[in-house]
Amino acid sequence: MSKYYPDISHHEKVTDWNKVIKACPFIITKATQGLTFIDPLLGTVIKECEKRKKPYWLYAYLNSGKELAQAKFLVETCRERVGKYFVGYILDVECKEGNNVAGVRDALKYISNLGYKSMIYTMYAQYTRYKSVIDKRPKNCAWWEARYGKNNGTYSKKYPTHKGVDFHQFTERGS
């Protein structure tokens, strides 16, 4: 049986927390983007997860350039907000322009040495670009890959991920 791990941000608001909490083993939510943006739902998601004892991950959507500084902004933004059910930090490295590979490597090393779990999120089509980072990621770091196929909200075996992926995002369509 598949498990669903929702990716929540100001783009995908939760309308029924009870339903989400019961259906999902953990929550993933956007915290920051770049060096200045803080997702307006960050506080609400953390509060709801802590109140309901639901594990949650926080991620930074990395704009191109200054990846380490963006990872530090993520941590500084979240450090005083997280609670007992916080799992770890995620770096979302899918921007169109592409992220600096060395910058992603440094940022991943930084978040992976904070005492929490870590994760890197990549797009299927960008695998070659980030392969060296993925292959040498720390032991406490999972790999989340987006490969949508038809992107109709339904999983299809016709669109597998790359070998070694821990979490497969098969749609950007919520339900």
Regions found by a protein language model. Give the residues of each.
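Short, aromatic/basic amphipathic alpha-helical patches
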Residues: F73-E76, D106, K131-K136, S156-Y159
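Flexible, glycine-rich phosphate/dinucleotide-binding loops
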Residues: L35-T36, G65, Y127, N152, ...
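Aromatic-lined carbohydrate-recognition surfaces of secreted/lumenal glycan-active proteins
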Residues: G115-R129, W143
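Short beta-alpha junction loops
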Residues: S64, E94-E97, M123-Y127, K150
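Substrate-binding cleft of extracellular glycoside hydrolase catalytic domains
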Residues: M1-K22, I28-K117, N140
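Short, well-ordered coil↔helix boundary/capping segments
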Residues: V101-A102, Y121, K157-T161
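Functionally critical loop-and-helix segments that line ligand-binding/catalytic clefts
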Residues: M1-N18, P25, I134-S175
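Glycine-rich, charge-decorated loop segments at or immediately adjacent to ligand/cofactor-binding or catalytic sites
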Residues: E67-A69, Q126-P138
